[in-house]
Amino acid sequence: RLYGKAGAPDLFLKHGRDTVASDLLDEMVRLRWMANHIEVPAVTHFVSTTDEAWLLMTALAGETAYQALEARPDERKTIVDALADFLRTLHAIPISECPFTSDHSYRLRLARKRIDAGLVEEDDFDEEREGWTAEQVWQEMHRHLPFMADQVVTHGDFSLDNLLMVDGVVIGCIDVGRVGIADRYQDLAILWNCLGEFDEALQDRFLARYGVPKPDPSKLRFHLMLDELF
């Protein structure tokens, strides 16, 4: 994070090589597209070479949703309501206007490549899958296929750390490199899982507020396992 002088915005600089450089390119083009639909950091500069990339962008104001939930336990219900409302706004963006694909078929192909290349961090799996190999996750995940996709514009990594809040309202999101058309459970599953750290009742409240009081458990499990591979 680069702190601006008085009256100037703070900035964030991301740098990476090889696959990370490719990820930064993905994030840059999505930031520019998302800026027409929802609050995201503004790209100020992007530079790339054959194997490196630098992305400079403005910093959003506020605190992360995780910080808000930690700091104000008595406000957790209203915070969760705000998260659900923001996700509904995101998912209401017309898919006809989105040029990016992030559906499960596409991400399965990427996940297979990551497994074969040994890039999956198996020691970072959720407690439910502690001790599993990436191949075990892959095999178990396929037990939940096929399913009928309910496509919307998704964030792709809709976690508490990627949502910024000011005065109880979600004002924007960050880390948008996975934005694209996919099943809505791509986002629902990740945030639902994050809220489990705080309270199962908050998980239920989030889904009900969003509009799925009776979620599809198979879709939840599939998308959580898919996320383990990234």
Q: What are the functions of these language-model segments?
A:
Residues Y3-K5, L31-A35, I115, F125-E128, ...:
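Alpha-helix C-terminal capping segments
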Residues V20-A21, F147-V153, V166-R221:
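Active-site Asp-x-Gly
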Residues R221-F230:
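Short, amphipathic C-terminal "tail helix"
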Residues L25-M28, D81-D85, E135, Q139, ...:
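Generic alpha-helical structural signal
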Residues R76-D81, T89-G156, P215-D216:
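An alpha-helical support segment within catalytic cores of ATP-dependent transferases
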Residues R1-G7, F12, P99, Q136-Q186:
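Active-site acidic catalytic loop and adjacent metal/ATP-binding pocket
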Residues F46, T89, E140, C194, ...:
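A generic secondary-structure signal
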